[in-house]
């Protein structure tokens, strides 16, 4: 059985690990970005649309503005989810194509 020193093993596995590390970093960055969007955007749009659009501009009652602001928040959640799926799908096919060409 051959003995491999640490430098030889590191040199053999380093390029593959670094490629996976970049892919993992990119995936984590995408996930954190869309997580932040998923938390802040619907909540922010809920309160801002309730106060400024529905009650302020359109003059709706408090009860009606709650209802329509909730619809805005739900639509926003669906838009963010659709954007995440699109970006994740595009990133996955790009990585698959790059791996296929190697």
Swiss-Prot record:
Membrane topology recorded in Swiss-Prot or TrEMBL: Multi-pass membrane protein
Entry keyword Transmembrane helix: yes
Segments passing through the bilayer: 31-51, 67-87
GO biological process, one term: vacuolar proton-transporting V-type ATPase complex assembly
Cytoplasmic face residues: 1-30, 88-102
Keywords: Cytoplasmic vesicle, Endoplasmic reticulum, Membrane, Transmembrane, Transmembrane helix
Cellular localisation: Endoplasmic reticulum membrane; Endoplasmic reticulum-Golgi intermediate compartment membrane; Cytoplasmic vesicle, COPII-coated vesicle membrane
InterPro entries: Vma21 (IPR019013)
Signal peptide limits: none
GO cellular component: endoplasmic reticulum membrane; endoplasmic reticulum-Golgi intermediate compartment membrane; ER to Golgi transport vesicle membrane; lysosome
Membrane topology (Lumenal): 52-66
Keyword Endoplasmic reticulum assigned: yes
Pfam families with a match to the protein in the record: VMA21
Domain of life: Eukaryota
Role noted for this protein: Required for the assembly of the V0 complex of the vacuolar ATPase (V-ATPase) in the endoplasmic reticulum.
HAMAP family the UniProt entry points to: VMA21
Family: Belongs to the VMA21 family.
Quaternary structure (record): Associates with the V0 complex of the vacuolar ATPase (V-ATPase). Interacts with ATP6AP2.
This protein's name: Vacuolar ATPase assembly integral membrane protein VMA21
Source organism per UniProt: Gallus gallus (Chicken)
Higher taxonomy: Eukaryota, Metazoa, Chordata, Craniata, Vertebrata
Gene symbol of the encoding locus: VMA21
């Amino acid at each position: 059985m051959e003995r491999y020193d640490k430098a030889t093993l590191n040199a053999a596995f380093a390029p593959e690990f670094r490629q996976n590390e970049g892919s993992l970093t990119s995936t984590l960055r995408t996930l954190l970005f869309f997580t932040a969007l998923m938390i802040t955007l619907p909540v922010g749009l809920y309160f801002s649309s309730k106060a400024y659009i529905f009650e302020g501009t359109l003059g709706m009652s408090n009860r009606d503005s709650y209802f329509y602001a909730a619809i805005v928040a739900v639509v926003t959640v669906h838009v963010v989810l659709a954007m995440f799926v699109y970006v994740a799908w595009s990133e996955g096919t790009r990585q698959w194509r790059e791996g296929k060409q190697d």
